[in-house]
Amino acid sequence: MRRGLSSGITLVELLAALAVLGIVLTVAYSAMVSGLRVQTDQEAITTSQAKLRRVVEVITQDLRSAVFGSITNQPFTSNDRQISFALIAGGAGYQVLPHDSGNNHSFRTANNVQIIATVANAAELDLAGRQAMLVNANRQAVIFNVGNVTQRGGPGSVEWSLVHDGCNNTIDYTPNTLLFRIESLGLRYDAATQTLYQRSGASEVPLAFDISGFRLDYVYEGTDGTTEIRSSPYLSPAGQPVRQFTRPDGVVLQLVRLQVSISAAAPSQGRVIERSFTGQVELLTGNKSFGIDEVVPCN
């Protein structure tokens, strides 16, 4: 009588099956780890991109609100790592009156301004102790701190006198000279701490942390159709940023937009993933008869 065939498996077959199983598990594990790594990387990238986009949106929104797109050197000197500009802090521009003498020299050297405002009292103006910007039709502006505000001509008068000690009007009076209540705003990047700061008045607060790179570019367009990108704005003889600059070859350049480039590094699976984001903002130019080409320092 013959012995029946064994229904079991041999040791070799068992080892082969285990080897195949090990290979399958290894492939599956590798695929799972790879998938998790891709997912983690994607989450880090998405988080970084969203963060950078929000920061750029905040910056560009502020820049769009700059008074006639004016770039200044208060509180920071404007360059590729920091920028200053003026925001309208409320109300429309107030009409400025000429001085009684009608002499521009007396207006330039005076430390007071008379305006027309249909308000019941000085408190409604909310100018005392605030910053103001004087803008003339020559496209010049000056910023000063308002001291006291008094009514001229008695009760019911719409004329008000603003005194700003320690700073003259500096610019000429022209028809259609206006005064705005403003707030000087500055942005500053500290590469050592990788922090972007925002300063308003004497207060400086962090705007964004863990920023690995930050750069500002000033985009000028020429009357000859050329575009020039600079790491700092053109300056006037007084050292102030100007919207319009005439090159030695006669080409007139106009500052039309700012480009903001920002980057951040995010940790992922023991590695660092760096992402960048760039945004541009068009600067308001006013119109042909009124705008700001230069914010001059008061003297």
Role assignments for model-derived ranges:
Residues 148-209:
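Small/polar beta-strand repeat architecture
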Residues 64-73:
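Short, well-structured beta-strand/strand-turn elements
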Residues 96-98, 171-175, 268-271:
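Flexible, membrane-facing loop/turn or short amphipathic-helix motifs
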Residues 46-47, 60, 73-76, 88-91, ...:
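Short linear sequence signals and composition-biased patches located at protein termini or domain-edge surfaces
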Residues 1-3:
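N-terminal secretory signal peptides that target proteins for export/translocation
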Residues 7-60, 64, 297:
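Aliphatic-rich helix starts adjacent to a transmembrane/signal segment
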Residues 50, 120-123, 272:
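Residue-level detector of secondary-structure boundary/capping sites
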Residues 74-170:
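Autoprocessing Asn-cyclization modules and mimics
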